[in-house]
Amino acid sequence: MKSIDLTILSLKRKGIRTEKVLKNQNPDRLSHMTDKNAQPKSKEKEE
């Protein structure tokens, strides 16, 4: 379980980094990504 948690954390960190990069490069794409990512993130919080 710990290894799974670590991979999820690393993926979240990478996702945050990529979102920051996209903000600088493609604001339009970021709005689409945040809409898609908003649903899974809220589901994780509920769990």
Swiss-Prot record:
Origin: domain of life: Bacteria
Organism: Bacillus subtilis (strain 168)
Protein name, entry field: Uncharacterized protein YdzQ
Region (Disordered): 19-47
